[in-house]
Regions:
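Catalytic phosphate/nucleotide-handling subdomain of diverse soluble enzymes
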Residues: 316-337, 343-352
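Condensing-enzyme catalytic core mediating Claisen C-C bond formation in acyl metabolism
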Residues: 1-61, 173-243, 247, 339, ...
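Acidic, glycine-rich active-site loops and adjacent beta-strand->loop/helix elements
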Residues: 92-98, 132-137, 161-166, 203-204, ...
Length: 352
């Protein structure tokens, strides 16, 4: 038995934030020293490396669960189902609801419970819980939903990925420019024609890799040292991803009934354009092949890195023909992959 998506939804915040937004920021390095480069140079290098020209921020009156609700409602409409028939709501995020101009995370009750409330679902046996798994959280939620359905514990699951990273960034850290807000969702149920999830794989590296992404103090030493922000060791993450993610993708393909030539698209977490390109190039090199043309759709240029939301948003955009030269047709085999805090990696193969 395989399980497939019957509805996909997204919510892209309306606030467009270009790189010009950061021109007046004062950036420091990890030692608390003001960066020598001017902000125009920093912005130029950011675009060259990550591909990011602009990103989206949630409105001041919105929090992560609001974004997740909008994406969930979109997926339910797309599936044309009664929300009361959903057995599980799995909400992937990392920082809970953080109100504008605060840094305190609110995770009780769970964001999944908040979405269930907003959807007005009365069924008490619709179970709502959160997944904290770094950027791969939405993919992991899909893998868990797949397991629930296969085990006979559910017939229909709603998996949400949403984040408001703009609320947890250090304005004095140039990495702030990478992060964005957004939400995506999908509804999974059993397939009658063996289409859907064909194979999957997850891994956690939690030794020296554990703190490659972490919560740390501002680079501005004059700020309150007890206030924490999202921080990362970019070079270490890049090297880790390039080393581990292609191998995981290959193992997933090799453990399935497909081969590398069957893959129509690779939908990968929108973390960094150069890193994603390097991962896919390394993946194909493991098969002694060049990267096929138009294999990897991207939306990071305009939407930035919204963590768990990047993959479902990207998938919805492809399905809606919103990306030039990227379509998914019936029968296509798509490889999904993500990497993030933990450090966690996951991947699954899906036939449409």
């Amino acid at each position: 038995m395989t399980n497939h998506f019957i509805g996909i939804g997204k919510y892209i915040p309306t606030e467009k934030i270009s790189n010009l937004f950061f021109e007046e920021h004062q950036f420091f390095n990890e030692q608390g020293e003001i960066l020598d480069q001017n902000n125009a140079t920093i912005s130029y290098k950011l675009k060259q490396i990550t591909g990011i020209e602009e990103r989206r921020y949630a409105r001041k009156d919105q929090v992560t669960s609001d974004l997740g609700y909008m994406a969930a409602a979109s997926a339910i409409t797309n599936a044309n189902i009664d929300a009361e028939t959903i057995d599980y709501i799995i909400f992937a995020h990392n920082f809970g609801d953080v109100k504008h101009d605060t840094i305190q995370s609110d995770m009780v009750p769970s964001l999944a419970a908040r979405v269930k409330n907003l959807l007005k679902i009365q069924n008490p046996y619709c179970v709502a819980y959160d997944v904290i798994f770094g950027c791969p959280g939405w993919v992991e939620g899909v893998i868990q939903a797949n397991a629930f359905i296969k085990a006979g514990l559910a017939k229909r699951c709603l998996v949400i990925g949403a984040e408001t990273l703009s609320r947890v960034v250090d304005e004095h850290d140039r990495d702030t420019m990478i992060y964005a807000d957004g939400a995506g969702a999908a509804i999974l149920e059993a397939s009658t024609n063996n289409k859907g999830i064909q194979a999957h794989l997850s891994a956690s590296y939690a030794n020296e890799e554990k703190d490659y992404l972490f919560f740390g103090k501002s680079y501005n030493s004059e700020k309150c040292p007890n206030t924490k922000y999202i921080k990362m060791y970019g070079r270490k993450i890049y090297e880790f991803a390039l080393s581990k993610v292609p191998l995981a993708m290959k193992k997933c393909v090799d453990d399935s009934s497909y081969n590398i030539d069957d893959i129509s698209k690779i939908v990968i977490h929108q973390a960094n354009e150069k890193m994603d390109e390097a991962i896919v190039k390394r993946f194909y090199s493991l098969y002694d092949q060049d990267v096929p043309k138009n294999i990897m759709p991207m939306n990071i240029h305009k939407l930035g890195n919204s963590s768990v939301a990047t993959i479902p948003i990207l998938l919805k955009m492809i399905m809606d023909n919103d990306l030039e030269n990227h379509q998914i047709n019936e029968g296509d085999v798509v490889l999904f992959a993500s990497v993030g805090a933990g450090m966690n990696i996951n991947t699954f193969i899906y036939q449409f």
